[in-house]
Amino acid sequence: MTVSDSPAQRQTPPQTPGGTAPRARTAAFFDLDKTIIAKSSTLAFSKPFFAQGLLNRRAVLKSSYAQFIFLLSGADHDQMDRMRTHLTNMCAGWDVAQVRSIVNETLHDIVTPLVFAEAADLIAAHKLCGRDVVVVSASGEEIVGPIARALGATHAMATRMIVEDGKYTGEVAFYCYGEGKAQAIRELAASEGYPLEHCYAYSDSITDLPMLEAVGHASVVNPDRGLRKEASVRGWPVLSFSRPVSLRDRIPAPSAAAIATTAAVGISALAAGAVTYALLRRFAFQP
């Protein structure tokens, strides 16, 4: 699922001096829930879905409880399977166009205040290095796509539901979870030409171990117990994100075209270089 195909957002590196071949494009893959945002993206929309008549009060309470458990202890494979069953059963018969409309209308009120400032900074740093940014989530594509666009991501990979006559059947076409995430990443890398050994990945959950293993540079964010143990054994960096902020309060990361233009102006280039250097030092990765 491509979020944007514009040249500025694709971040293709320029031709290197001397006419040599350009450096291969690389990517940074981000889990969404509890890595970029502080809650479950799907469960966060339970209130607007209720307000528009898609959920009853009992379903809202059940979703709130699931959110509490998710935040309290993270979600293991069994919990994720139960959550998947609950959510697919809940949305059977929903009108897809209505869901998309609700998400688009309420996105900035519901989700963008939950974005970790540290995650937004890290995404900006990767973009300044010329990398594509890919959001990878087990949540539905109707939710993940708009969030990814708001973050300035290049691609989004998410769970796809089966749709008939414009309504969800309650069955899943592709579950973007566990090994499914890793397979989706490998397929995108093959399509886009990403050398995965030079790519980055970030997640909070042990269930995303296959995704982290698929790249050359893995880091864990606010990890659950299982993933923290794996990170210790493998020597993966452990990042702590704790400051949710509104994207409306942040200045968007400059595009590649903007960077190239301002680079010709000494003072602008110096400022951009200082920002880039500070971000790279903060998150300890190579340009």
From Swiss-Prot:
It is an enzyme of class 3 (hydrolase). SUPFAM superfamilies: HAD-like (SSF56784). Residues 7-23 have a biased composition (Low complexity). Mg(2+) binds at D31, D33, D204. GO terms for molecular function: hydrolase activity; metal ion binding. It comes from the Bacteria. It is a single-pass membrane protein. It is found in: Cell membrane. The chain crosses the membrane at residues 258-280. Binds 1 Mg(2+) ion per subunit. Residues 1-23 are annotated as: Disordered. GO terms for cellular component: cytosol; plasma membrane. Disulfide bonds: none annotated. Belongs to the HAD-like hydrolase superfamily. SerB family. NCBIfam families: HAD-SF-IB, HAD-SF-IB-hyp1. This is Probable phosphatase Rv3661.
